[in-house]
Amino acid sequence: MIIHGFTPVRSAGFLISCSVFVLQFAVGQSKDSSQAISVSGFVDAYYSKNFADPASHANKLRNFDIPENQINLSLAEIVLQKKAQPIGFRVDVDFGTANDVVQGIAPYGTTPYSTLTNIQQAYLTGVIPIGNGLTADVGKFVTHMGYEVIESKDNWNYSRSLLFAWAIPYYHTGLRLTYPFADNFTVALHVVNGWNSNIDNNAEKSLGLAVSYSPSGSTGLMLNVMDGFEQPPPFDVGKKKVFDFIVTQNVTDAFALTLNADYGDETLISGLKTWRGAAVYGRYAFNAKSAVALRGEIFDDPEGYATGLGVPQLDVKEVTATYEYKFVDALLVRGEARYDFSTTPIFDKKANVNTVNGQMTFLVGVVAMF
């Protein structure tokens, strides 16, 4: 709920003021503590054109590049971090339409605005001296699920995959325990309040598991699992679970491949709902400044539940090509062409025209980092 006298505008201003204060404090502290506290961030903006000219001016089935035919501030982020030696912390403060989607606030959701809305992550971290060192994180943190992440600069493509948008959560609030059994084998356990939840909506905790293994320096394997009740009483009749599998392969120093596959289901009063999909990625770096990346994927949503469209036998595919160039280390520019298509006509077109089976978009994204 919104506290009387503490409107979204006032709270946003309050958070900005706090961020500036903490930033100044952190810089001062880092000078006195041999850079113990690191400060970084970026501003991410884009322009997208949908050639179907949708009357809604929205790219259907996207999550972080929804508005089209307009310049959009996707994400502005400030990160303050102190490594656990043995105690540390991390705080990510976010603003922009991508953050609105992550937090589920209007116009992309119904979650009331709060001071937590602009906190992507905020957790305490500590290393417990057991064996190789058990790391414990307590607070709000991004999910371990999926190959892609919220920040576009850390992905191979600018737009996010269907799997990232619809198959998995964005963040959790709770406890994360990580233990490195070896340099190439790590296991993490999560006990959290559920999917995209600051406060749990039922009496049960959700469990997460992340297992990563690198059989060689060029190959990486990861299995991620989420399992728990996600509906409020009296609708919490069954669990929601997702299995997420990732394989990465550096073929050469310049060429890399990735496979990401997901399966999820949830038991509701109305029955079992399922979703599944897979994405294949390839990236070739011409040099330190420029690279090209391709992504192809399929997402199957038989009951239309994961996407929220309610369309039966929904089968969606997409192909994305992205070229990137770094003018300087702190400025990343990307041009991207993407085609989404479905067995069912779900994509918007011009006013008074029926929906169509596909949409073609072109996007230019710019990220300035510090």
Please report, for each region that a protein language model flagged, where it lies by residue.
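Outer-membrane beta-barrel channels and translocator barrels
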Residues: D32-S34, K83-I87, P129-N132, T143, ...
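Outer-membrane beta-barrel pore domains
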Residues: R62-D65, N99-V102, G109-T115, V149, ...
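Glycine- and aromatic-enriched membrane insertion/assembly motifs of diderm outer-membrane
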Residues: I66-N99
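Surface-exposed coil loops of outer-membrane beta-barrel proteins
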Residues: K49-Q70, N99-Q121, V127-S216, M222-F229, ...
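Cleavable N-terminal export/targeting peptides
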Residues: M1-S33
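Outer-envelope exported proteins of Gram-negative bacteria
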Residues: S38-F42, R90-G96, T135-G139, H190, ...
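Residues on the lipid-exposed face of transmembrane beta-strands in outer-membrane beta-barrel proteins
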Residues: G41, N69, L73, I78-K82, ...
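Outer-membrane beta-barrel biogenesis signature
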Residues: C18, F25-E68, V142, Y147, ...
